Design a protein with these regions (language model features):
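Conserved inter-motif catalytic segment of the P-loop NTP-binding fold
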Residues: 145-230
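Phosphate-binding/switch region of NTP-binding enzymes
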Residues: 235-239, 243-326
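A short amphipathic alpha-helix within small helical-bundle interaction modules
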Residues: 19-22, 33-55
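The Walker A/P-loop phosphate-binding site
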Residues: 32, 69-177
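Single conserved hydrophobic/aromatic residue that forms the stacking wall/gate
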Residues: 1-12
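Amphipathic alpha-helical transducer elements in NTP-driven molecular machines
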Residues: 96-99, 103, 112, 127-128, ...
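Conserved catalytic network of the ASCE P-loop NTPase/AAA+ motor domain
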Residues: 108-110, 141-146, 171-178, 202-207, ...
Length: 326
């Protein structure tokens, strides 16, 4: 089970503390919290009182007290020392793409506790990366995987179990086993997409959630909120969705991968006019940003355009029948 830190210990050391240990949380309240998908302190500590009140059917004042107590017991929300943060960083795992050039570009692989945005034009290979990492996530840790379950939110009807089967066989894996650990839902509009993020939280009990994929993140928002008059509302909704995804990454020590569409800036005087959808909201929410483009001979180019700790750079790889390869 996922564990949370106590105030008496170092900020990120884990020990088994249950929601019943919170002051004022009796059996009835604990049952409501669990029915709403809250099993641990960290999940409560990152909620807002209004959201917790709505999800768990509690009063807002009660919710505020529960959240405050959870933050105190998990020692979240105050200043911490740099060495404590370094200890937290040691918990980060890396999911290998099993493509050496991509792993080298990312300093060893795709980090957990991070939101990775992959953007590019149609046919640049965004969905292929999502499928490949979904397969790889089910691998044992000593083989570059996370030995975890994957949740895949499909907004464009592009998930193909047949492709997962091809990639699994390319790694010598049992396709049925791999598919059993990938949980897929089709999102039909932006509201449904946001609800599915909440559903992941509820379904995570009993599963080792290690990866969440949204393919693609912005397509519904872009189609439903049209024109400058709707831009502020679109960005507000998108920001809320991104925060929910980041919470899932933090609470589960998981990787969130989102694919994104692009548009061309006709007024660009120099450089590449291709820009990702989502504006500054998505740019600030993304921990890492990868820009994919096609190259000659069926090759793809991945460029790391934003990272908190790695230099910009690019690599070349191929999409084959068996999956991604150098």
């Amino acid at each position: 089970p996922r564990l949370v830190s106590s105030a008496a210990s170092d900020v990120y050391k884990r020990q088994k503390v249950t929601i019943e240990d919170l002051p004022g949380v009796g059996p009835a309240t604990a049952e409501k919290l669990r029915e709403a998908g809250f099993e641990e302190l960290l999940g409560l500590a990152v909620m807002s009182p209004a959201d917790l009140a709505e999800e768990a059917e509690l009063g807002e004042a009660v919710s505020a007290k529960i959240i405050a107590a959870a933050k105190k017991m998990a020692n979240i929300g105050g200043f911490v020392s740099g060495d404590a943060l370094l200890e937290r960083r040691r918990e980060v795992q890396k999911l290998s793409s099993r493509v050496q050039s991509i792993d080298d570009l990312l300093g060893g692989g795709f980090e957990t506790q991070a939101l990775v945005e992959v953007y590019g034009e149609f046919g640049s290979g965004k969905t292929q990366i999502g499928h490949q990492l979904a397969v790889n996530c089910t691998l044992p840790v000593d083989q570059g995987g996370l030995d975890g379950d994957v949740f895949y939110i499909d907004t464009e009807d592009t998930f193909r179990p047949e492709r997962i089967t091809q990639m699994a066989r390319g790694h010598g894996l049992d396709p049925d086993y791999v598919l059993s650990r990938i949980h897929v839902a089709r999102a039909y509009n932006s509201a449904h997409q946001m609800l599915l993020a909440d559903e992941i939280k509820r379904m995570s009990k009993g599963l080792n959630v290690k990866m969440i994929i949204v393919d693609s993140l912005t397509s519904h928002f872009r189609a439903e909120f049209i024109g400058r008059g709707m831009l502020a509302r679109r960005q507000q909704k998108l920001n809320s969705h991104l925060k929910d995804l980041k919470k899932l990454a933090d609470v589960n020590n998981a990787l969130v991968l989102v694919t994104n569409q692009v548009h061309s800036k006709p007024d660009a005087m120099w450089g590449d006019p291709t820009k990702p959808i989502g504006g500054h909201i998505l740019a600030h929410a993304s921990t890492f940003r990868l820009y994919l483009r096609k190259a000659k001979g069926g090759r793809r180019i991945a460029r790391l355009v934003d990272s908190p700790n790695l230099p910009d750079g690019e690599c070349v790889y191929q999409v084959t029948e068996e999956g991604l390869r150098d």
